[in-house]
């Protein structure tokens, strides 16, 4: 599956998304853009199954993490145009 995972700079470094991911796609890396000093990173997107648990776990109102499903998945779900 080819999904892309985008981490936005609104990430507060809380680690909720990392803990929610059942496949360890995400990890925290050093970053000086928030108080926590870390930001989520997605080094293993090839393992992402598109469950979007990371999005659900994100406590920010603007979803600092988004999973964009690949064309095969959206087609099989009847979401393709």
From Swiss-Prot:
InterPro entries assigned to the protein according to its UniProt record, in alphabetical order: 4Fe4S_Fe-S-bd, 4Fe4S_Fe_S_CS, PSI_iron-sulfur_center, PSI_PsaC
EC code(s) of this entry: 1.97.1.12
PANTHER family, A to Z: PHOTOSYSTEM I IRON-SULFUR CENTER, PHOTOSYSTEM I IRON-SULFUR CENTER-RELATED
Class in the EC hierarchy, top level: oxidoreductase
GO molecular function: 4 iron, 4 sulfur cluster binding; electron transfer activity; metal ion binding; oxidoreductase activity
Subunit description: The G.violaceus PSI reaction center is composed of one copy each of PsaA,B,C,D,E,F,L,M and Z, and forms trimeric complexes.
Positions with a binding annotation for [4Fe-4S] cluster 1: 11, 14, 17, 58
Cofactor(s) needed by this chain: [4Fe-4S] cluster
Location in or out of the cell: Cell inner membrane
Domain 4Fe-4S ferredoxin-type per the UniProt entry, residue ranges: 2-31, 39-68
Principal place of residence: membrane
Record membrane topology: Peripheral membrane protein
Name of the featured protein: Photosystem I iron-sulfur center
GO BP, sorted A to Z: photosynthetic electron transport in photosystem I
Binding site for [4Fe-4S] cluster 2: 21, 48, 51, 54
């Amino acid at each position: 599956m080819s999904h892309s995972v985008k981490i936005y700079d609104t990430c507060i470094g809380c680690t909720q998304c990392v803990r929610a991911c059942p496949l360890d796609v995400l990890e925290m890396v050093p970053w000086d853009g928030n108080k926590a000093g870390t930001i989520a990173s997605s080094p293993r997107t090839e393992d992402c199954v598109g469950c979007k648990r990371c999005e659900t776990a994100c406590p920010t109102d603007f979803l600092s993490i988004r999973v964009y499903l690949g064309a095969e998945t959206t087609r099989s779900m009847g979401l393709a145009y």
